[in-house]
Swiss-Prot record:
Interacts with HTRA2; under apoptotic conditions. Interacts with ABRAXAS2. A zinc finger (THAP-type) spans 2-85. The gene is THAP5. Residues 86-113 are annotated as: Disordered. Has sequence-specific DNA-binding activity and can function as transcriptional repressor (in vitro). May be a regulator of cell cycle: THAP5 overexpression in human cell lines causes cell cycle arrest at G2/M phase. PANTHER family: AGAP005574-PA (PTHR46927), THAP DOMAIN-CONTAINING PROTEIN 5 (PTHR46927:SF1). Its main location: nucleus. It comes from Macaca fascicularis. This is THAP domain-containing protein 5.
């Protein structure tokens, strides 16, 4: 018997899954009564849907007066109509996790943007500035969020410096001009940080967060490790990619170029993240590059589950449980092994049956022989026959 589950939207009740203290019963649709069936479908908000005889509704959707309890069994009345349903809109409105995530995103955006404005206005009055150019071509036309984190070494004594960070967003294969964002960074001997937020016409958002305890010039001079972390979130695949790059070189370098190809975004084009860092006692030159063979890249994919995907997963789970031969984790070899085992059991049962029939026939022949020789009385023959009949019944 196939396990029953409720066919109502956003109802995941099924037989055997619920708690023991809850008693659920499932009732088929009234396919023979069209007027009553229309009322059922109208209350379910599925007027155009045609149910089958293998689909049911659970008792949670019926009021207590719609059920008739007899001998401890709940029967559905002939005039009962389900009236208790929770629509997807209600579930989305009552979902606390989605509300919390939306509020958190709004708070983060509100905190990030004012800090960027204050830092930009403060650094414009300073005189000593270092320029860092970052050219980021978009990996996907529907890129939602991108963030970069630069962590230099431990704090040391040094001079106060101001860094200018210029971010150029270049849209490839589009007719729109390039968009440029200039953000100034104030850097102190202690701890300096900056936040900036940028949005263009295509809702492309780039957020940069930097926490520095000394200048890039000093970090290159001490030949320490420079870490760059980039997070991407793309709408079509609902995936979050994290890339961490660590480079440590013995000699001062002029530029470092990082190439990253993201296969999860279903695109064959290569997205390039270029980070240019000025070296000691030299001016930045666009034509000079140094290979970054010691750089390591770590990609982490995090799936974001949505209520729609949960429903799809639940449907596939029910399908796999009900139809075990359609399960994806079973291959043909496993099924053939099961078939061979069943065939071997069948042949073994056939052999046992033949042996039992042979014994019965030999006993019948012995009884006939004894009758012919008059070695048995009628009473003894009846006893033996009764014994044979009981033996046959037990074997069957």
């Amino acid at each position: 018997m196939m396990p029953r589950y409720c066919a109502a939207i956003c109802c995941k009740n099924r037989r055997g899954r619920n708690n023991k203290d809850r008693k659920l019963s499932f009732y088929p649709f009234p396919l023979h009564d069209k007027e009553r069936l229309e009322k059922w479908l109208k209350n379910m908000k599925r007027d155009s849907w045609v149910p089958s005889k293998y689909q049911f509704l659970c008792s949670d959707h019926f009021t207590p007066d719609s059920l008739d309890i007899r001998w401890g069994i709940r029967y559905l009345k002939q005039t009962a109509v389900p009236t208790i349903f929770s629509l997807p809109e209600d579930n989305q409105g009552k979902d606390p996790s989605k509300k919390k995530s939306q509020k958190k995103n709004l708070e983060d955006e509100k905190e990030v943007c004012p800090k960027a404005k204050s830092e930009e206005s403060f650094v414009l009055n300073e005189t000593k500035k270092n320029i860092v150019n970052t050219n980021v071509p978009p990996q996907h036309p529907e890129l939602l969020h991108s963030s970069s984190l630069v962590k230099p070494p431990a704090p040391k004594t040094g001079s106060i410096q101001n860094n200018m960070l210029t971010v150029n967003l270049v849209k490839q294969h589009t007719g729109k001009p390039e968009s440029t964002l200039e953000t100034s960074v104030y850097q102190d001997t202690g701890i300096g940080d900056f936040h900036t937020c940028f949005e263009d016409l295509n809702s492309t958002t780039i957020t940069l967060t930097t926490s520095n305890s000394e200048s890039i010039h000093q970090s290159l001079e001490t030949q320490d490790v420079l870490e760059v972390t980039t997070n991407h979130l793309a709408n079509p695949d609902f995936t979050s990619n994290s890339m961490e790059i660590k480079s440590a070189q013995e000699n001062p370098f002029l530029f470092s170029t990082i190439n990253q190809t993201v296969e999860e975004l279903n695109t064959s084009k290569e997205s390039v993240i270029a980070i240019f860092v000025p070296a000691e006692n030299s001016k930045p030159s666009v034509n000079s590059f140094i290979s970054t063979q010691k750089e390591t890249m770590e990609m982490e994919d995090i799936d974001i589950e949505d209520s729609l995907y949960k429903d799809v997963d639940y449907g596939t789970e029910v399908l796999q449980i009900e139809h075990s031969y359609c399960r994806q984790d079973i291959n043909k070899e496993h099924l053939w092994q099961k078939v061979f085992k069943l065939h071997s059991k069948i042949t073994l049962l056939e052999l046992k049956e033949q042996q039992t029939l042979g014994r019965l026939k030999s006993l019948e022949a012995l009884v006939r022989q004894l009758k012919q020789e008059n070695w048995l009385s009628e009473e003894n023959v009846k006893i033996i026959e009764n014994h044979f009949t009981t033996y046959e019944v037990t074997m069957i």
